[in-house]
Amino acid sequence: MTKALIVVDVQNDFCEGGSLAVAGGAAVAAAISQHIVTSSYDHVVATRDYHVDPGAHFSLTPDFIDSWPVHCVAGSPGASFHPELDVSGIEQVFSKGRFAAAYSGFEAENDLAGWLTERGVT
């Protein structure tokens, strides 16, 4: 069996100090890095929120359901992976949400499901 780990959106804007911070995000990033080192996956991939112009997804008065504060803007520090996440073992990054909201790596512009299937991950 071919095993893969999908690391989901471990970005600065979702960790402490970011525009949509989750408490403990930096610790999670470090724990994921350690997990990658101590586990045996055939493939490690990551997703990232990477907004170019997501339309109504951003709002100055977000409802936190359909609209959100500005976050993970393409090329910004907030869109970068958190420094506690060691990206050296990540084989492929799948960006999502460039021009519309996307909440799953399987919605990404790149074909995550196809990429995994091509490598025998089921």
Show where each model-derived region lies.
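Active-site acidic carboxylates
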Residues: 1-101
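Alpha-helical scaffold elements lining the catalytic groove of polysaccharide deacetylases
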Residues: 97-119
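Active-site beta-loop-alpha substructure in enzyme catalytic cores
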Residues: 122
